[in-house]
Amino acid sequence: MINIWRALTHRFFSSGFENWLYWDANQLVRFHIIDRKDGNRVGVFTAEPFFVFHHINAFERDEKIYLDACCYHDNSIIKQLYLKNLRSPAEPGQKKLDVTDVRRYEIPLGELYDADTEKPLHKGSDGLDYSSLCSGIELPRINYEEFNGKPYR
């Protein structure tokens, strides 16, 4: 989440953008679904907390929106990417950087009924509200000219 006060006053206090952000492990992620025709919100779905730098793609198929993103369990990756931390050796037995998890969220369009009511995403038999596609990818690249907003492999 963003602390607006810190964002507005960062120049006075010489603080970086990471100080505008704060992590709340109890705060659910919200997916706001917007109608492409009129720009109105038509629904809100929630998921377990995660931190994301980069979205890969989103597309609609079979009455669902599929959203793929590179996700972290929390925002600790921000400080891990500081130059001083990247230049220093990792402690024995400690990982230097968190590994991203490429996740696919399936948002059921058939369950849109109230733009102001938050509805949790369905959880699978594994208890997760997403599918894990792979790990270790950041700065993803797909053929955007051909597949942006469309299904892909």
PLM regions: where:
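Beta-propeller domains
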Residues: 1-153
